[in-house]
Amino acid sequence: MQIYKVGGAVRDRLLGRPVTDIDWVVVGASSEEMLARGYRPVGADFPVFLHPQSGEEYALARTERKSGRGYGGFTFHASPDVTLEEDLTRRDLTINAMAEDEQGRVIDPYGGQADLEARLLRHVSPAFAEDPLRVLRVARFAARYAGLGFRVAAETLALMRQLAGSGELQALTPERSWKEISRALMEPNPEVFVQVLHDCGALAELMPEVEALFGVPQPAAHHPEIDTGVHVLSVLQQCARHHQPLTVRWACLLHDLGKGLTREADWPRHIAHETRGLPLIDAINRRFRVPRDCQELARLVGEYHTHAHRALELRPTTLLELLQSFDVYRRPQRFEEFVAASEMDARGRHGLEQRDYPQAAYLLGAAQAARAVSVKPLVEKGLKGAELGEALKRARLAALKAYKEERGKA
């Protein structure tokens, strides 16, 4: 029985990055032997055990064979005669197919160390093309390590194109797809994830609504980058630079989908793209069974982001309607995330990344002014029901008028 550290822990140590999760592979042992040593079984599909003291995962060395479509279409074979090299060959990338023995020696049968040096994301074997989830995983690794100069190897990108064109991506479950997408959006360069999917044809399969934005022009006066797809990539880049949460990043990815529906004859203007994009946002949210908080913010940002850009010009009545649309009195954080997404949209324009966005402070101040209105004096006057609601609305409108006048004097 031999135990090896494998995968990400070896890769990240060689890169000089913090090692958070450690995976182990056990060669030459059976399930019975693991149980006899006190390991607890947790693997439903193949033999994985938890260490009795550390709680870390130990998997028996195994091979796998394609047996159906999609991420789960594999049969596994785990036994004491499976070698370390056989176990490593089933892994996706060479940089993830290294092991380390108990003396700290690196076992690297597929050139992972050389690819780390060359900053290449390269597949281990042609079996890479059997698992469609690997398209998303490679794009996610590209987003993680772009800052270190990593790029996808040309031959690996070719295999990803093959997978994208095979229809296999459609066999991925919504849950698995969302898990990879959400993790990728939180990487240091989420725009690289989208770019790689675009380059290999997978974006057109998974999110055709986003793919449709590439090549669609916008007015150069407002968008020096012109291309709407390029703009979305820039907005995601700003999200990462400003450490935005997943809700904001997801909303930013989808905020301009309506521009993909504009007739070429109307380019580069995109009148009413906000409302035209809402059915597309709803469709993507359903497709990946996106969590409710991400769904709601994406829809609201899609509908109202241009309101934010024009915030300083909005009448108090329009401003009040905007705040009520967000239920800002009970859910102030959602409005704050909307403002953040709108600011990322404004900053995601080439050459305008550092331009001030006074709309953010103005909108947050307006929300504070409206929320400061107390219902207590109105209740003490004996108002209730619809009459109370109308009186509260008038009081909030008066507060917003006063706020706007005060800001106008500043």
Swiss-Prot record:
It holds the Pfam family PolyA_pol. Gene3D superfamilies: Beta Polymerase, domain 2 (3.30.460.10), cca-adding enzyme, domain 2 (1.10.3090.10). CTP binds at G8, R11, R91, R137, R140. Mg(2+) binds at D21, D23. ATP binds at G8, R11, R91, R137, R140. Coiled coil: none annotated. Residues 228-329 form the HD domain. It catalyses: a tRNA precursor + 2 CTP + ATP = a tRNA with a 3' CCA end + 3 diphosphate; a tRNA with a 3' CCA end + 2 CTP + ATP = a tRNA with a 3' CCACCA end + 3 diphosphate. Its EC number is 2.7.7.72, 3.1.3.-, 3.1.4.-. GO terms for molecular function: ATP binding; CCA tRNA nucleotidyltransferase activity; cyclic-nucleotide phosphodiesterase activity; magnesium ion binding; phosphatase activity; tRNA binding. One of its GO terms (biological process) is RNA repair. The keyword Transmembrane does not apply. Its cofactor is Mg(2+); Ni(2+). A single active site specifically recognizes both ATP and CTP and is responsible for their addition. Monomer. Can also form homodimers and oligomers. Comprises two domains: an N-terminal domain containing the nucleotidyltransferase activity and a C-terminal HD domain associated with both phosphodiesterase and phosphatase activities. This is Multifunctional CCA protein. The lineage of its organism: Bacteria, Pseudomonadati, Pseudomonadota, Gammaproteobacteria, Pseudomonadales.
